[in-house]
């Protein structure tokens, strides 16, 4: 009923998640309570600003994204030289 029966619980309701690695994947529901896996989009809520800060863009390597701003400034050059126009 109350506190004594809580000690009898020994089955895991959550196991490791394939996406985020946390022990938040609900075995019966087949969804992660942390990242929302297997949903395509990551789970994030506005009431959890601290949690958002931990896992948003910029907390990892950003192997691709960190170069995009520089390439944007130059107009995404492809490496092919522009055709020379004869000056008048």
Curated annotation (Swiss-Prot):
GO terms for biological process: translation. The keyword Ribonucleoprotein applies. GO terms for cellular component: cytosolic large ribosomal subunit. Gene3D superfamilies: 2.20.25.30. Binds to the 23S rRNA. Belongs to the eukaryotic ribosomal protein eL37 family. This is Large ribosomal subunit protein eL37.
């Amino acid at each position: 009923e109350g506190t004594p029966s809580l000690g009898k619980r020994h089955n895991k309701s959550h196991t490791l998640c394939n996406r985020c690695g946390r022990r938040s994947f609900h075995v019966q529901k087949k969804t992660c309570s942390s990242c929302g896996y297997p949903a395509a989009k990551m789970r994030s809520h506005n009431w959890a600003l601290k949690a958002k800060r931990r896992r948003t863009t910029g907390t990892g390597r950003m192997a691709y994204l960190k170069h995009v701003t520089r390439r944007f400034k130059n107009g995404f050059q492809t490496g092919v030289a522009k055709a020379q126009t004869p000056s008048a």
